[in-house]
Amino acid sequence: MLANAIAALLLGSGIASAAGHGSPLTSKAGHRAVIPDWDLKSSSDVSKDLGGLSKPGVDTSSWYHAGTSRCTIMGCLINAGVYNDEELWYSDNLNHVNWGQFSVPWVYRHEFALSPAKGKHFLLQTNGITSKADLFFNGKQIADKEYQSGAYAGRTYDITNLAAKKNALLVQVYPTDYLYDFALGYVDWNPYPSDNGSGIWRDITIKETGSVSMGPVSVLVDIDVPVEKNPARVTVRAEAQNLESHAVEFNAAAVISGNSCSGEALKQTIKLAPGEKKLVQFTQTIKTPSIWWPKQWGDQPLYTAEVTFSVKGAVSDTAQTKFGVRKVTSFVNQFNDTQYSVNGHPFQVIGGGYGADMFLRWDSERFTRIVEYMLDMHQNTIRLEGKMEHPELYEICDEYGLMVMPGWECCDKWEAWAYNDELAIFPPPVWDANDYETANYSMIHEAAMMQPHPSVLTFLVGSDFWPNDEAVVLYANALKNAGWQTPIIASASKRGFPALLGPGGMKMDGPYDWVPPNYWYDVEPSEDRLGAAFGFGSELGAGVGTPELSSLRRFLNQSDLDDLWKNPNKNLFHMSTNASSFYNRKIYNQGLWKRYGAPTSLDDYLLKAQMMDYEATRAQYEGFGALWTASRPATGVIYWMLNNAWPSLHWNQFDYYLHPAGSYFGTKVGSRIEHVAYNYQKKEIWVINHSLYQTGSRNIKVELIDMNGKQIAKKLVQVRTKANSGFKAMDISSDINKLSSVAFLRLVLSDEKGSVLSRNVYWVTKTIDELNWDESTWYYTPVSKFVDYTPLNTLATAQVSVTTSGGKHLPGIPGSQTRTVTLENKSSVPAVFIRLTLVDSKGNDVNPVSWSDNYVTLWPHEKLQLEVGGWDGSGDKIQISGKNIKATTVKL
């Protein structure tokens, strides 16, 4: 290892990007600047004299040029125009990329100017290189691949003695092997990227300081419950390091600003011996703090902490961070299930598992849209399994009020424990001393990055398997030293746990492939009911997420499209990897064929798929919501998955192009803040309330009609809702059991003033899908007898009119273009599963888009108003289709 490497990464704020050699990259002490772009080339095509290549003035005109500060090799090549992701995604084109070119190291290079002078120091900071690299600066090697190892192991190098007016940085990145390197793998989520994610996927920065440098700023907030009535004790910390060979005295100052803060500086004078490091901390009490809440529960006020180190009256280093006042705790209940609490209130985790872009490209605007989609679906948490992304992610979640559940990933080097018998190789490549060091610095870096953010709910130091005792001590110490204050969870499964942390309290028993809606309510006996709605399900779902035709045509050719409905058991490239259990839609399609009937066309298949997807996600979230306060509570649910790394045929709540379809709106309905739901298993009506304070009298209107529109039953019941709970309101089994065919069940929840809080329509029969629990696998439970929804194929045609008018700009319907869409069923039969799509003047989908509701079913002669928000203002028409209506298009 190289002696000039500083052990801890210096994180801070105020990062700027500068380009060109004319002006210095950094301008003053405390300034951090990003290396703005890269020239890159395969090591097989450049000189072996890397030291020489790292000197200024080398001709790189024949190299690829990537105009971005962070990119894997493939990401860089796409940026440089060598590849186009629309072409890569199409059909099986990804399989035809020359993977061999990535079997050798690649070289990244950038030249920049600095202004060295006496008293100035320059620090080079890596934040994420996948997965190992040699670093050269101005002709000298400053790190080797043994030291700069691990995708998350940020390191800091003092380059002061090498800095000149003209400088060159060269990074040689080595090929990544997920089983042997600490990287960002995709397991069975999708095909692997051609380069296995190798490259500079996070920014490299140059920081200018004076004699004393500053480490990451952390903020510890201590507050008692009830948080609304207590002061907050805030401690701001940062490590100071003397970079000189002589003692230095410096002044440290911190300013905390925000509501109820005076803004006065807290000051200290400190003396450091040569090279000495010391933790500097300041404490202030905020008497009446503004509390940060998850979005569904309140506002997201943020405070700012700014720390400055000065030597002889001049700034030596400075940084600031935002933070929030909130309190997160957890406990493992009597059933060995983890339950979280936020600000003293039981917090049911409702969310999805995030998928990073296949080539690890970050887009803040796109992620913001994803967060807004999640909040529109009434989700409160996003799980990051080994995909911790960038500081911007946490800043966005802080601002929007979405909780984040980060942690290490499964199934590769991160979990290469002697007791892990589920890796792709055996015996596992267990960690050596260098691996433990890499893991340690990975945790140090990530803990420092995430610590101040109020959106961070927890950290999972394991996913499928728990870390061994040596690793867990490293992880726990790194988190503790960073000032970590939220729960540390051993793993996302119940396979085992380290004594230091205790049980993780999360289950990972599937399903990952299709199961029927009643699965979630079939909770007894719980020891045999796997993923049903009890406990904390860390990753589970019916595997649905079928894109609509407009999206499918962007990545499938005609033969691929035909396979969807003509070859239901065929392996499909746009599913999982070719070695996984999820490489086809066989299980899903069996359910579709048996329940809805063999499709007669691609359009028919896709409509039936959207009905399958809608009922699947709705039932999952309703089941967990209804049983949140059951005798064995359903404490958390993470749908597998939220989104995909590329255009995929499954495992998403909206597709790669941000088009929301059946799985999205099933989730949105099933997760409503106040909701009324049908328990398929017991044929009961349940009331769900995810709010903190919304209570009082509620009316539930229950109506059951047959396929001809004839009323079978009608009931009105009044209940008193309970905040943050789910409870049974009534039993309708006697009505359901009388059915002779498919019927429609409409549930409407209203408040005392008659305002509709939730409207929900089901297609039901007197039977339910019969699950064969004894034959369950780790990824699904088979169905021994399917319900029969094929009578839906004989529905009489309904006539529906569609009109549009100026929008109401309802909360939750963002966009520059908001309209009201009024649907009216002018028939005596129900209009079933009406889908609406906002398109532009050319007929292309407008994405992202917000709908107050979609895929709706109308009673005979019912009128329903929906709101639509077109985000970019390009909406021109609305396309309407459904199970038993004629497809039409109306002008917006």
UniProtKB/Swiss-Prot annotation:
It comes from the Eukaryota. Optimum pH is 4.0. Stable between pH 6.0 and 9.0. Residues 19-28 form a propeptide. It is an enzyme of class 3 (hydrolase). Keywords: Carbohydrate metabolism, Chitin degradation, Glycoprotein, Glycosidase, Hydrolase, Polysaccharide degradation, Secreted, Signal. The active site is at D464 (proton donor), E539 (nucleophile). Optimum temperature is 50 degrees Celsius. Stable below 50 degrees Celsius. One of its GO terms (cellular component) is extracellular region. Its EC number is 3.2.1.165. Its main location: secreted. GO terms for molecular function: exo-1,4-beta-D-glucosaminidase activity; hydrolase activity, hydrolyzing O-glycosyl compounds. Induction: By growth on GlcN or GlcNAc. Residues 1-18 form the signal peptide. It catalyses: Hydrolysis of chitosan or chitosan oligosaccharides to remove successive D-glucosamine residues from the non-reducing termini. Glycans are attached at N196, N336, N440, N557, N578, N689, N825. It is found in: Secreted, Extracellular space. GO terms for biological process: chitin catabolic process; polysaccharide catabolic process. Belongs to the glycosyl hydrolase 2 family. Hydrolyzes chitosan and chitooligosaccharides with retention of anomeric configuration. Has no activity against beta-D-galactoside, beta-D-glucuronide, beta-D-mannoside, chitin, glycol chitosan, cellulose, N,N'-diacetylchitibiose and pNP-GlcNAc. Monomer. This is Exo-beta-D-glucosaminidase. It comes from Hypocrea jecorina.
